[in-house]
Design a protein with these regions (language model features):
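Residues forming anionic-ligand binding surfaces in small-molecule and nucleic-acid pockets
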Residues: 62-81, 171-183
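Beta-rich nucleic-acid/ligand-interaction surfaces
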Residues: 111-135, 139
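Long, positively charged amphipathic alpha-helical accessory segments at protein N-termini or as interdomain linkers
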Residues: 94-117, 149-201
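Short, solvent-exposed loop/turn segments at the edges of secondary structure
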Residues: 67-69, 128, 153
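Helix-start/capping segments and mature chain N-termini
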Residues: 67, 78-81, 87-97, 166
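Short, conserved charged micro-motifs
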Residues: 41-42, 81-87, 166-168, 190-194
Length: 201
């Protein structure tokens, strides 16, 4: 994610008028914390024993486990988007690009609920907002933004698969399969490489 920060600064310094889209995975696995999120819920000893790093994102939101997933970052000038000045509208405008990509492989995504957020959860994927992407009501992609000097950085995590027991150990809260889903659950035949190919076009 340091690269994303550097790319954001590069865009600002060079006054880029186009987008930067990046896909990546993590090795070793890593917990990323939202920009202003407290970290007192983390068991650092457990994470160290299991070779799981911890970083803090530039973007907001809540914590994610980057393990069996694909992370994306999208950088653009605020004025590049039709409604770039409006936070929720800009989330949706960027996310509609992902909706279109996933539709080509038979995965129809929609935006999450606009219900009040349950603020007790530390794990991002357990909270579905109107800017998140869901499959049949279950969250598949969680995203977060930051803004700096007229530019937007949006991060997102696309769940390929997940370890329910590990998530519950890290975040100390029940992970309901009624709340989240994964690419592997939707279509086990889809590989990470296929997803990356589709998103890269």
């Amino acid at each position: 994610m340091r690269i994303d920060s550097d790319l954001l600064d590069f865009a600002i310094e060079n006054k880029l008028d186009y987008t930067i889209f990046r896909l990546y995975a993590w090795k070793p696995a890593c917990v990323s914390l939202g920009r202003n999120q407290k970290d007192d819920f983390l068991d650092r000893s457990f994470l160290k024993e299991n070779n799981i790093d911890v970083v803090r994102r530039l973007t907001g939101g809540r914590a994610l486990l980057h393990a069996d997933e694909i992370t994306y970052s999208f950088i653009c000038p605020t004025l590049y988007l039709k409604n770039g000045e409006h936070v929720v509208s800009s989330y949706k405008e960027i996310s509609r690009i992902l909706i279109g990509k996933f539709k080509t492989i038979g995965i129809d995504l929609d935006f999450g609920s606009n219900k009040p957020i349950k603020t007790g959860f530390d794990y991002c994927m357990l909270i579905s907002t109107g800017a998140d992407l869901c499959y049949h009501g279950k969250k598949l992609i969680g995203s977060a933004q930051c803004r700096k000097q007229g530019y937007i950085l949006q991060h997102g995590s696309i769940l390929y698969d997940y370890d329910k027991a590990l998530l519950e150990k890290i975040f100390k809260e029940p992970v309901s399969t009624d709340e989240i889903t994964s690419i592997k659950e939707i279509n086990p035949k889809l590989t990470k490489e296929k997803i990356i190919d589709i998103l890269s076009v």
